[in-house]
């Protein structure tokens, strides 16, 4: 068996299957590696065994070696423990970003090199380009599927060793290729959500690790009690589904939206205005920012930002602070910018990097704050 030059992360899905097929067609010495990132908990909801069988079938059809690695311990320590800690603190984390940084482009890359591969490849909708001595992360050609948002924590060494073989494809073209070459995964549905939750009810799953208690749902304007919630951990800013608020005397028969939560007092705040001013922000401050180039383009610059996946680009001004965090000022007010989620910055199609959102200047968030406002500290 020849040593592979490229190790493809085969997930058992159609995207990684076509990625592997394209590399084989290009004459690369390819092998596939399936990562198990979540230990089977007996629920039958995380279909790792089905995915592994599909990955084996794809590698068999393509005539490439198949490898397996169990990264469930690494995932638990590097991703899941952080996921739980963030929810316990009342924030809304993004485990896919951490999974890419801590598992797929760290432990998978290490395993590939141990097996003799020079580079890795995945089925992400993104592109890599080289400009001089610098490696760039670019959005995928299919903007509706672009996954650069989840890859913004990658660095120069990782990008130099990474291929994204399907980054130039539209999803419809990828499906057609998979069907035309009879890949076993050509009709397989795209995976959605978080693997360790699968098809389970999110509240049921989270409740196994973070026991929650019921509390009051209040109107932030007058403090009146609207209803009762099953646990503040289960809700995020801007959320409408799952509140189960029936008719409220003296209130219109209209939907309610989460506009804030106070973990310390176990209170959820709601409003009937989808774009409630309680959760509109003009500025945010981040945790320490990561720059794909190794440094920011300037101490102060203009670019566009996304504060959630698939959000339209929003023009903003970025100021890099002395502690490595960034202060972002948006050109227009933003709805439901959520601490714990990822701020990702772009210059056109080039992903500059990003950071975890630490705080915003939304009125209700500022009112509930028990520590000095990070914006007042800057002003001082």
From Swiss-Prot:
GO BP terms: namely: tRNA wobble position uridine thiolation
The disulfide bridges present are 99-195
Annotated segments matching region Interaction with target base in tRNA: 94-96
Residues that hold ATP according to the record: 9-16, 35, 123
GO MF annotation list? ATP binding; tRNA binding; tRNA-uridine 2-sulfurtransferase activity
* Entry EC no(s): 2.8.1.13
List residue numbers at the site (Interaction with tRNA).
Answer: 124, 341
Subcellular location(s): the record lists: Cytoplasm
Active site as annotated: 99 (nucleophile), 195 (cysteine persulfide intermediate)
Q: Quote the InterPro entries the UniProt record gives.
A: MnmA-like, MnmA-like_C, MnmA-like_central, MnmA-like_central_sf, Rossmann-like_a/b/a_fold
Q: Where are the transmembrane segments?
A: none
Task: Show the NCBIfam families listed in the entry.
Answer: PRK00143.1, trmU
List, alphabetically, the PANTHER family matched: MITOCHONDRIAL TRNA-SPECIFIC 2-THIOURIDYLASE 1, TRNA 5-METHYLAMINOMETHYL-2-THIOURIDYLATE -METHYLTRANSFERASE
Instruction: Give the family from UniProt.
Output: Belongs to the MnmA/TRMU family.
Give the protein's biological function: Catalyzes the 2-thiolation of uridine at the wobble position (U34) of tRNA, leading to the formation of s(2)U34.
Its name, as the record gives it, is tRNA-specific 2-thiouridylase MnmA
Gene of this entry? mnmA
